[in-house]
């Protein structure tokens, strides 16, 4: 299973971003692949929060269009919504403890726990996820998995 970060969805959605074409193609391939594509609820909510935010985009995505984008992604063959399971809290605590997380690191540890709990590879344009030694992750455009 592969799990994607908020930034992957934002880049794939926003045609005004220079990364759009690469990430749009990537997300379309992942969503229609045989390998499951894990979509944590918090990532989906984060996507809607970012793309509809007037402080982030001069012309934000309308809430209706953002919800439609999520619905279309969830309807894709490989898409799987992920919710915290029985091991999520412990994985989250371990990841946070490993890096002495505070502030924004807490949110990243929480997201990384979805991948850890589901034995998945985390895909993010944020190379800061490398600090989580237990996490298997890769930059979406690199192709090289890091442990």
UniProtKB/Swiss-Prot annotation:
GO MF term (any one): RNA nuclease activity
Domain PINc: 3-139
Cofactor: Mg(2+)
Binding site for Mg(2+): 5, 108
Keywords of the record: Hydrolase, Magnesium, Metal-binding, Nuclease, Toxin-antitoxin system
Record carries keyword Nuclease: yes
Record-level GO BP terms: negative regulation of growth
Gene3D superfamilies in the record: 5'-nuclease (3.40.50.1010)
Enzyme Commission numbers on file: 3.1.-.-
Family classification: Belongs to the PINc/VapC protein family.
Function: Toxic component of a type II toxin-antitoxin (TA) system. An RNase. Upon expression in M.smegmatis inhibits colony formation. Its toxic effect is neutralized by coexpression with cognate antitoxin VapB43.
Protein name: Ribonuclease VapC43
GN (gene name): vapC43
